[in-house]
């Protein structure tokens, strides 16, 4: 399975707009991009390790998406989380996706894939294990199960 084309377009535009703040595709779409899982996703997660990065880029990302023909609504303002999280609802026609801009730790530099920077496979898996333990949604268990048995990318 490939990343949904609408979500991929949203991710590409947002990653370019936020590029100088270290954002990379994360969450389920990162695992899909690495070929570890096959499932539909409901959101696009972009993570940066830089303090305040979501707050610093949210307006720029909104403008870039609007210029690319998307309708953009602010779902959660970065001010609600000291600049560490922002959520946008992005739509065009009948297609809609939540775009999450968040600060998150990473150990490895992102992988450069066709879509743009994507969390290193080890960091993508680690983030999903953390999500599985922390929130325990079915999709987190599906994602972690999809990574079982894969060779470690680093030692």
Please report, for each region that a protein language model flagged, where it lies by residue.
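Compositionally biased terminal segments of proteins
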Residues: 1-155
